[in-house]
Amino acid sequence: MNSKKHLGHTARKRFGQNFLHDTSVIQGIVAAIYPQPNQFLVEIGPGLGALTEPVGELVDHLTVVELDRDLAERLRHHPFLHQKLTVIETDAMQFDFDELYTTENLAEKGQKLRVFGNLPYNISTPLMFHLFKYHDVIQDMHFMLQKEVVKRLCAGPNSKAYGRLTIMAQYFCQVMPVLEVPPSAFKPAPKVDSAVVRLIPHKELPHPVKDLYWLNRVCSQAFNQRRKTLRNALSTLFSPENLTALGIDLNARAENLAIADYARLANWLADNPPADVNNDEILDSEE
């Protein structure tokens, strides 16, 4: 028996497909999302419809973004949901959520996007960074992720899980763990534990920065050298005198600073950029 086959579809490794089938877990996720009939919901990676079906039954319309051509075609011909579904066959990493918000006239309706999904673990972090760019048009997000990633999203200072992903996620959103999910809830079963997280974009950013590039840059540089003191890790960006003037302990390490501290550092860099920095540099590294 092919353990990677579920409901007639073979999971594709390149898409990071693991299909959710545990009824109690599905019910728990749908309850957490709490979809209402007139809301505009968007599912990323609907797969074989484990969440699509129970959510679709509760709403008037559901938009799904699916990269797998075969799965997208199945959803277009879904036996009882096809009239409710708008299937967008594309890579969510390339999708413009602002355009969807505008096209659907959600501002006039006083609504924002509600986004959810069982995200492929191999792209979950860059996909969330992509979604953070659209925080102004998103009401909330509910995602199934690798448990380790959820711990990092929800972490606080002075912990091993605290890192660049924590800072960037909590800069844009209030982050809350929802439930933990064992590998047995999926087919094929992943080799890691999973968890569901809720992210609610802040209505007003609590620690706004002048240029997001610098927040990204200072976090990347600090956490990529997290065993070093900040005096050494950030030596190409700040002099010891600058750090001290900004209220930073020279002997502190990356995990010791709060988001407000990183925002303060980023705003100083926006006003005092180092001469040799390339602002087009792409910072996608994990900390």
Swiss-Prot record:
Q: Which GO terms describe its cellular component?
A: cytosol
Q: Could you say which enzyme class this protein belongs to? A: transferase
Instruction: Output the Gene Ontology terms for molecular function.
Output: 16S rRNA (adenine(1518)-N(6)/adenine(1519)-N(6))-dimethyltransferase activity; RNA binding
Please give the chief subcellular localization of this protein.
Answer: cytoplasm
Keywords, A to Z, come to: Cytoplasm, Methyltransferase, RNA-binding, rRNA processing, S-adenosyl-L-methionine, Transferase
What Enzyme Commission number(s) apply to this enzyme?
A: 2.1.1.182
Q: Which reaction does it catalyse?
A: adenosine(1518)/adenosine(1519) in 16S rRNA + 4 S-adenosyl-L-methionine = N(6)-dimethyladenosine(1518)/N(6)-dimethyladenosine(1519) in 16S rRNA + 4 S-adenosyl-L-homocysteine + 4 H(+)
- S-adenosyl-L-methionine is among the record's keywords: yes
Gene3D superfamilies in UniProt = Ribosomal RNA adenine dimethylase-like, domain 2, Vaccinia Virus protein VP39
Which sites bind S-adenosyl-L-methionine?
Answer: 18, 20, 45, 66, 91, 118
Concerning InterPro entries, the annotation shows: KsgA/Erm, rRNA_Ade_diMease-like_C, rRNA_Ade_Mease_Trfase_CS, rRNA_Ade_methylase_Trfase_N, rRNA_adenine_dimethylase, SAM-dependent_MTases_sf
Q: Where in the cell is it found?
A: Cytoplasm
The record's similarity note reads: Belongs to the class I-like SAM-binding methyltransferase superfamily. rRNA adenine N(6)-methyltransferase family. RsmA subfamily.
Q: What does this protein do?
A: Specifically dimethylates two adjacent adenosines (A1518 and A1519) in the loop of a conserved hairpin near the 3'-end of 16S rRNA in the 30S particle. May play a critical role in biogenesis of 30S subunits.
NCBIfam families noted in UniProt: ksgA
What PANTHER family has UniProt attached to this entry?
DIMETHYLADENOSINE TRANSFERASE (PTHR11727), DIMETHYLADENOSINE TRANSFERASE-RELATED (PTHR11727:SF7)
Query: Could you tell me what this protein is called?
Result: Ribosomal RNA small subunit methyltransferase A
Q: Upper lineage ranks?
A: Bacteria, Pseudomonadati, Pseudomonadota, Gammaproteobacteria, Pasteurellales
Q: Which gene encodes it?
A: rsmA
